Amino acid sequence: MTSSATSPTNGVDKNKNEEMVATPANCPYQLFNQEVVWNGKWIQTRQVGFKTHTGQVGVWQSVHRNTKPVEASADGVSIIARVRKQGKLYIVLVKQYRIPCGKLCLELPAGLIDAGETAQQAAIRELKEETGYVSGKVVMESKLCFLDPGLTDDSQCLVVVDVDGDAPENQNPVQVLDSTESIEVLLVEQSALMAYVTNLDSSSIVVESTLLAYAMGIQFATI
């Protein structure tokens, strides 16, 4: 969210002395007067003034997590769990009600990285907790990526894991959910993933962007 207007209504206090903020060499703005507007248990909101090279002034408001361990590579992980079961390839999905969206949301399993964990360790743990599936094989880990960089610095790594769906421990997966979580687990054949996502009733369920991008990538690979 940003406003580059110079009117007094854009959030910039014209009477406040500009306290400059250190910026990277490739930042095209002068930043000043950074402040925490609200600080909660899980997140905080901040705003910072900015000035363009033409002298236009605005304010940028953003949201930041309070939970990221200092040593963590990202805030969290999203997990692409490929389940091979009875000769077929499935993707593990989760469905849960998201209060900010006001709807059910179809997603990849995901979660925050705990202190002392790597992204891969967090992925294995979160997969077990959210879905009950057990995996000991990490196929790949992505580089750091940001989820909505115009609004937040919330970040993740994508971790791809393989799951033996025929193994005894994966015959009847048991979730290990927090007391406030309500998550439904689905197995969808990878070859039918895009069709499954496309045919959802969008009036009652939405699709998380990382999952949609993955489904579109699978579809485009066959074109």
UniProtKB/Swiss-Prot annotation:
UniProt short sequence motif Nudix box, positions renumbered to this chain: 111-132
CDD domains with a match to the protein in the record: NUDIX_ADPRase_Nudt5
UniProt GO molecular function: ADP-ribose diphosphatase activity; metal ion binding
InterPro entries given in the database record: Nudix_hydrolase, NUDIX_hydrolase-like_dom_sf, NUDIX_hydrolase_CS, NUDIX_hydrolase_dom
This enzyme's EC code(s): 3.6.1.-
Any one Gene Ontology cellular component term annotated for this protein: nucleus
Entry binding sites for Mg(2+): E126, E130
PROSITE patterns: NUDIX, NUDIX_BOX
Residue ranges occupied by any Nudix hydrolase domain in the UniProt entry: 72-213
GO BP annotation list: nucleoside phosphate metabolic process; ribose phosphate metabolic process
PANTHER family per UniProt: ADP-SUGAR PYROPHOSPHATASE, UDP/ADP-SUGAR PYROPHOSPHATASE
This protein's name: Putative nudix hydrolase 2
Provenance organism: Caenorhabditis elegans
